[in-house]
């Protein structure tokens, strides 16, 4: 079942209690602006954000413009300096699928604890996984480990928002990577933008149970 969702509702729902959500946005390039909009609202309330960028889409100017807009429109009582928001967002970039896995499974859990960052945004998690130079069996196993790590973070009350650009690949097997990732999320939304405005379609909502220890390895062996 699908349903249209206003972007403000989506942002509020993701930020609302209880923490520990797994959301996935996919579609055209507007998924990245929508994610930054969600991040900016969280930063406005003082919530530290960790952003993992696998597709070089982070836009510092968007957040700076957001700060100026909320000040000029008097959405807040005091002037919001862009620097105050930007100093509370931590960026990590991954240029290969191996770096992406290491960032999410090894570095991210300790980092969010150290920085008290309850919200993580990941741009283009799978972009580097589409590189044909990376063996498919390694990519599939890596994705399973990443999914397990995301569920562990959810269990520690960390909310995660994935933003992915829809792609049509020549490899049918690699085309199956994104559906596998999306199916492991609590909610998935398809986002497009046209002359009529932004359209957000809620595609699914499921109650995910955290993966048990060993599930990722067992699933990888079954591929």
Region spans (language model):
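Conserved inter-motif catalytic segment of the P-loop NTP-binding fold
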Residues: 52-132
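Short, well-ordered alpha-helix to beta-strand connector turns
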Residues: 19-21, 46-47, 86, 157, ...
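P-loop NTPase motor core
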Residues: 111-184
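Conserved beta-strand scaffold positions in the cores of enzyme catalytic domains, especially
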Residues: 22-24, 49-51, 88-91, 188-190
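The Walker A/P-loop phosphate-binding site
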Residues: 1-69, 81
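Soluble or luminal CAZymes and related metallo-dependent hydrolases
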Residues: 6, 99, 141-145
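Phosphate-binding/switch region of NTP-binding enzymes
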Residues: 151-223
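Conserved catalytic network of the ASCE P-loop NTPase/AAA+ motor domain
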Residues: 16-17, 42-44, 82-84, 111-115, ...
């Amino acid at each position: 079942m699908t349903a249209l969702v206003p972007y403000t509702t989506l942002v509020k729902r993701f930020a609302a209690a209880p923490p520990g959500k797994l959301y996935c946005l996919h579609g055209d390039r507007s998924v990245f602006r929508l994610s930054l909009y969600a991040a900016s609202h969280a930063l406005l309330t003082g919530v530290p954000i960790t952003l993992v960028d696998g597709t070089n889409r982070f836009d510092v100017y968007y957040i700076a413009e957001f700060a100026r807009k909320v000040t000029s429109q008097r959405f807040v009582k005091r002037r919001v300096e862009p620097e105050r928001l930007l100093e509370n967002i931590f960026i990590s970039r991954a240029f290969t699928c191996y770096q992406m896995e290491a960032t999410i499974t090894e570095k991210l859990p300790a980092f969010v604890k150290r920085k008290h960052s309850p919200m993580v945004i990941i741009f283009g998690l799978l972009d580097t996984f589409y590189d044909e130079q990376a063996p498919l069996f390694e990519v599939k196993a890596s994705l399973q480990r990443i999914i397990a790590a995301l569920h562990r973070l959810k269990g520690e009350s960390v909310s995660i928002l994935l933003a992915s650009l829809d792609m049509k690949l020549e490899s049918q097997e690699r085309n199956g990577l994104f559906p596998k990732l999306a199916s492991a999320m609590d909610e998935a939304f398809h986002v497009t933008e046209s002359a009529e405005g932004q359209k957000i379609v809620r595609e699914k909502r499921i109650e995910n149970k955290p993966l048990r220890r060993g599930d990722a390895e067992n699933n990888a062996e079954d591929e």
